[in-house]
UniProtKB/Swiss-Prot annotation:
It catalyses: pseudouridine(1915) in 23S rRNA + S-adenosyl-L-methionine = N(3)-methylpseudouridine(1915) in 23S rRNA + S-adenosyl-L-homocysteine + H(+). NCBIfam families: PRK00103.1-4, tRNA_RlmH_YbeA. One of its GO terms (molecular function) is rRNA (pseudouridine-N3-)-methyltransferase activity. Its EC number is 2.1.1.177. Disulfide bonds: none annotated. Homodimer. The keyword rRNA processing applies. GO terms for cellular component: cytoplasm. Keywords: Cytoplasm, Methyltransferase, rRNA processing, S-adenosyl-L-methionine, Transferase. Belongs to the RNA methyltransferase RlmH family. InterPro entries: Alpha/beta_knot_MTases, RlmH-like, tRNA_m1G_MTases_N. Coiled coil: none annotated. This is Ribosomal RNA large subunit methyltransferase H. The gene is rlmH.
């Protein structure tokens, strides 16, 4: 099973790539994390956010792996703990489908895309920069995996 992170945005600072890569390389081969950057739609004054999100939705849908479980990151999503994420990983692996985590652009994810998702997940109650979410999600996926392996990275 692969864990795909589809994130709207590009040209991230070097420290974001370094942080993301650090956690991605720690994952075992059977749970590889792959980042796919989705080109953000050009914003202009007077253009409604709905139009921007719809254009980004088309790009995200084109990048989605076939038959993947879709987890859309959204501020109104389920507020899981790390332990809940760790509990989900083994069942997702048994399911056999890849998992695609979706990170929207500046306006968020298109409502049709969120409706299509298997799950809406809240990463934080805080407002975070999109770039930071990539690193945070990769770290939490690594931490969740270490919990399933009784690895000492996670301490309670």
């Amino acid at each position: 099973m692969k864990l795909h992170i589809l994130a709207v945005g590009h040209k991230m600072p070097d420290w974001i790539a370094t942080g993301f890569d650090e956690y991605a390389k720690r994952m075992p081969p059977e749970l590889r994390i792959e980042l796919r950057e989705i080109k953000p739609e050009q914003r202009s004054s007077g253009r409604p956010a709905e139009s921007v999100m719809a254009a980004e939705r088309i790009r995200i849908e084109a990048a989605l792996p076939k038959n993947a479980r879709i987890v859309a990151l959204d501020e109104r999503g389920k507020d899981w703990t790390t332990m809940q994420l760790a509990g989900a990983l083994p069942s997702w692996q048994q399911d056999g489908r890849d998992v695609a985590f979706l990170i929207g652009g500046a306006d968020g994810l298109d409502p049709d895309l969120k409706a299509r998702a298997d799950m809406l997940l809240r990463v934080s109650s805080l407002t975070l920069p999109h770039a930071m979410v990539r690193v945070l999600l990769a770290e939490q996926l690594y931490r969740a995996w270490t919990i399933t392996q009784n690895h000492p990275y996670h301490r309670v």
